[in-house]
Amino acid sequence: VIFRQLFDSVSGTYSYLIASRRGAEALIIDPVLEKVDRYLQLMNELDLRLVKAVDTHLHADHVTGLGALRDRTRCVTVMGEHTKADVVSLRLADGDKLDIEGVSLDVIYTPGHTDDSYSFTMDDRVFTGDTLLIRGTGRTDFQNGDARAQYDSIFNRLLKLRDDTLV
């Protein structure tokens, strides 16, 4: 499996590039608009074809790269079914699968930080967007956030995953 964690220091956003192998289909989670050229360069270096670009939620701290990636690669843009974003061509529900060649992610609805927050699990990893952060959680005081829903998402969904799950 190809797994690259990419960091945008301006917004503090982690993005993730995933594929089963060189020359395969790829997906990217939480792309930042200003980093689109870098993502495309990396995919070219790894001989990957972007087929899906995913946002875990509507972001207030950066402009999403979904639209630019769709326009430049014709990839499918993906978010959870509760999103109000208009750039989305595929909306997923809790319990759905997000599949590309050789890789499958499970979809978990994890509202709280926003009302459209979703997490994605892949083997021993979970991609939580801003639901869980390093040393904390995402804010709940804007974007239809709800502290009680976030508590429930963290303690009754995410912390119920296997103990060896990487966040």
Please report, for each region that a protein language model flagged, where it lies by residue.
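Conserved beta-strand hairpin/beta-sheet module of binuclear metal-dependent hydrolase folds
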Residues: V1-R49, S119-T128, R135
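Active-site HxH/HxHxD metal-binding segment of metal-dependent hydrolases
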Residues: G12, G23, L33-Y109
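Generic anion/oxyanion-binding catalytic loop in active/binding sites
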Residues: I28, L58, R139
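Divalent metal-coordination and catalytic microenvironments
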Residues: I18, D30, H57, L69, ...
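Metallo-beta-lactamase
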Residues: A24, S104, T114-V167
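Short beta-strand
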Residues: F7-D8, T110, V167
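Residue-level preference for alpha-helix termini and adjacent loops
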Residues: Q5, H62, H82-K84, R91, ...
